[in-house]
Amino acid sequence: MSRPVRTTAAVVALALAAALAGVPQSTAAPSATPSATPRANHVLETRVLGESVRGRPITAWHMDNRADGKRKGPTVVLIATMHGNEGAPRQILRSLRGGQAIHGVDLWLVPAYNPDGLAAHTRRNAHGVDLNRNYPYHWVDLDGNYESGSRPGSEPETRAMMRFLGDVRPDYVLSFHQPLHGVDTDNKRPAFSRRVAHALGLPATTLDCGGVCHGTMTGWFNHHFKGFALTVEYGARPGSQRMREDAPPQVLKIFDAFRSAKPPKQELIPPP
């Protein structure tokens, strides 16, 4: 049943304050299992940001660039699978986590932001909420495929990400999606957006949400922080080679970052 649109400044303010209260604690990396995949030993921190509706951990990996004495570079957060049926770009983040040492950027990776949706191969989380309509910025009450939740910041995944971004305060956030095939340039930093599009081989365009772009993560972040969050849309079937081999160095190039040429020591860890 359709519900009337409702926005409440007080509710939004309370949701923001509640979500940013407290700092998430770091946890040790999980132990290896027989189904583990190779990962380079270049992870500085493994942080559990929170849990999904079904109790699955939402994990971020902080890549270690301390060996690069020249410059730390910008702080960058890469996020994949906000929508669980848009899983291909997750391979980009897993490749960055598992390859050679990364220099010139302070990099955080969140490969599985919506682990319940990923497991079920659904856009929304286990409550049936579109996480990219649940943020307390221009939130409205939406139904159907874009169900926005009972209130702004109602979902544990949303609150976990809000706390994390409020703690890290990155210079840049790239949120990877499918299948619209383009990078939105209708934002506060169009020149940087065009740079991203060029580096990734995607069209620079205006992504029209059809009138339902309310409560988005990028909108919330860009309103509250000095940094810049950008949505990157790959196509429906970008191809495994593009995701695993081509895109990771392209992403680093955006920030003038690079990898070591020497193969790293590797260990086995479970995939996210």
How should each PLM-predicted stretch be described?
Residues 1-31:
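Secretory targeting and sorting signals
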Residues 26-40, 271-272:
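Composition-driven, intrinsically disordered low-complexity tracts enriched in small residues
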Residues 41-47:
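Short, hydrophobic/aromatic-rich segments at coil-to-beta transitions
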Residues 52-53, 70-82, 86-207, 223, ...:
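Active-site/substrate-binding loop(s) of hydrolase catalytic cores
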Residues 54-63:
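A short loop-to-beta-strand scaffold at the N-terminal edge of the catalytic core in hydrolase folds
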Residues 63-66, 225:
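Active-site beta-strand termini and strand-to-loop segments that position acidic
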Residues 185, 211-272:
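Active-site-adjacent mobile loop/cap segments within catalytic or ligand-binding domains
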